[in-house]
Amino acid sequence: MEGWRISLLNEKEKTIFVDADACPVKEEIMLIASQVSVRVIFVASFEHYQLSRSKDENWVYVDPHKEAADLYIANHVRSGDVVVTQDIGLASLLLNRNIAVLSERGRSYTEDTIDFALMSRHMSGKMRRSGIHSKGPKKLNKEDRNRFVTLLKKILSNDEGISNQNIE
């Protein structure tokens, strides 16, 4: 049926999209989202497919190409949704579309911070190509997790008009 597209998403339902291949805060996302009845869609490569996924979780599997998960998210996210990603390039694509974008370390990507993040990424890539390698990011710690939980609760409570204290 040319011209017809079936959408699995309710047009008015807020959704949290998670770039899930390496996301360490999936449990926190599910817990918070269930408390405020917000839909979560985890997007991952087929390389990370698991039969044991909970039936309460919504998983979308994409080809194992480098940007496939990012492209899926960029094509399906709507104004007012929330995206959790560590991909600065994806974050920069989404910011001007009224989408809240945050990292799994609890950092909010904004129009004010994205240029610096993109420049830092560019400079790090340039250094790697010239043979200078730096350490990767530190392992996610409890402080990072707490910062993430606090930020996600704040975003959802502001959007839904509910008290942040009502989200445990």
Curated annotation (Swiss-Prot):
InterPro entries xref list: UPF0178 (IPR003791)
Membrane spanning residue stretches: none
What family does this belong to? Belongs to the UPF0178 family.
**Protein's name in the database:** UPF0178 protein RBAM_023530
Q: Which organism is it from?
A: Bacillus velezensis (strain DSM 23117 / BGSC 10A6 / LMG 26770 / FZB42)
